[in-house]
Amino acid sequence: MNDVVLSRRQLLALAAASLIPDAATADLYDEYINSTSKQPVVAFLARKGVPGHAFVGIGVRLEAGLTVYERFFGYYPAASGTASEVKLVFGKVSGALDYKWKDTAWDEAYVVQVDDARKASAIAVADKWKGADPKYNLFASGGKNCSTFASEVAAAVGLKAPSGAGSMLPASYIEKLKKANGAP
């Protein structure tokens, strides 16, 4: 019961932040709760720019075609500031698997329907990264970055993950991931 209440609070907070009218918020919640078909999905998402950012959304697609994301995971440098920025280019810094509000917007997306076991595999990769920080490096030189996280999740759910994820801009990596798996 607590999971349902927590999910409802999260869903309503997201809806309120998106400036959805009150009636639509209730409809969205009802659509999610009353859905008879919740097909698990894993989404590989990226924002363009330099350096950009790749992240993973995990959720369900309802029978009405609406995708509801239950979790977002992005790998970020844990610290900020000039010294940290220099170090993350030339060395390794502590990283953090986290969710940020800006992870609700993306320029590139590859959404894959999966079964419950593959959804659990995606979550297991996130749990592994949360439990043992692999160390962040912008170019994945001796460390890992947001694109390598997306690549590990892709492999865990059975996708063909292109090599060199850490050395590509995130949006470019998601484009290559789509092409490698036959998506337009």
What residues fall within each predicted segment?
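Activation targets extended, charge/polar-rich intrinsically disordered C-terminal tails
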Residues: 38, 123-184
